[in-house]
Structure formats: structure tokens, C-alpha cells
């Protein structure tokens, strides 16, 4: 799915690692969070019981939600969610959906790494 949205995003594995390492950290406001595609964070923001819904989705994805919640509470260093920002300002979550939605459900504004892309997300 991601390959169809981001065709030829990385030339090879080393290119990908380099882009991730050099990406900047940002804190998104609610409007930006809602505008990210390929994530459930908008649904979490709209949910009356944010935590319950985030846990339900994390379970559906086979994620160890207890470890993520515990890690967020204890301020364990996790890899940040990765977001691609294209030439038009469109945002696409490349990885970290469970961390992002559980963090939002807990009331945290987690930093995300933003990779700028000169092309357009499909």
C-alpha cells in the first residue's frame, strides 16, 4: 500500500536510513494530526473513550499495547512515528500508528519525525 502512495520514495535501504536519521522532529497540533493519512489518530481524537478505542485498534493490529502504554508512562525512548510531508504539504504516516494513537489517547503530544519529500503523495 505504501509503495503505491510513495512511488520511488527511497532509492535503497541506505537512502531510507539516511532520510530517517536526518528528518526533523516536530510536534503537530490537532489540525495537523487530523490531516495525516494512513493513521487512526483522527478516529481517536473523535472518540468519546479515546483509550478504549486506541487499545481496541492496537489489539486489532497485533500490537503489544500494554508495552507501549507502559513505555509512554515511564518516558521510555521509542522510535518516533514517521511522517512524510510532500511538496503540497500533504502528510502520510509511514510508521508508528500504534504509538501515535495511544499517545494521543493518553493526552500526550508525541514528537514525530517529518521527512520532506519533493514529490507528491499519490
Language model: regions and residue ranges:
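Amphipathic, charge-rich alpha-helical segments that serve as recognition/docking helices
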Residues: 116-122
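Short, well-structured hydrophobic secondary-structure segments
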Residues: 12-15, 24-38
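Glycine-centered loop/turn positions within well-structured domains
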Residues: 79, 100-101, 110
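N-terminal extension/subdomain marker
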Residues: 1-16
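Serine/threonine-rich, low-complexity intrinsically disordered segments
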Residues: 4, 22-24
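A sequence-level detector for short glycine-anchored, His/Arg-bearing signature motifs
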Residues: 90-106
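Short alpha-helix boundary/capping and kink motifs at helix termini
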Residues: 36-94
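Short hydrophobic/aromatic-enriched beta-strand-loop microsegments
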Residues: 110-116
Amino acid at each position: 500500500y505504501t509503495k503505491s502512495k510513495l512511488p520511488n520514495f527511497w532509492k535503497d535501504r541506505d537512502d531510507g536510513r539516511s532520510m530517517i536519521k536526518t528528518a526533523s522532529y516536530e510536534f503537530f497540533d490537532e489540525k495537523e494530526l487530523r490531516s495525516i493519512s494512513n493513521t487512526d489518530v483522527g478516529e481517536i481524537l473523535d472518540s468519546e473513550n479515546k483509550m478504549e478505542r486506541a487499545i481496541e485498534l492496537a489489539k486489532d493490529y497485533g500490537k503489544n499495547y500494554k508495552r507501549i502504554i507502559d513505555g509512554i508512562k515511564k518516558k521510555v525512548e521509542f522510535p518516533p512515528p514517521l511522517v512524510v510531508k510532500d511538496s503540497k504539504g500533504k502528510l502520510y504516516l509511514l510508521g508508528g500508528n500504534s504509538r501515535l494513537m495511544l499517545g494521543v489517547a493518553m493526552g500526550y503530544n508525541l514528537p514525530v519525525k517529518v521527512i520532506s519529500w519533493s514529490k507528491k503523495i499519490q
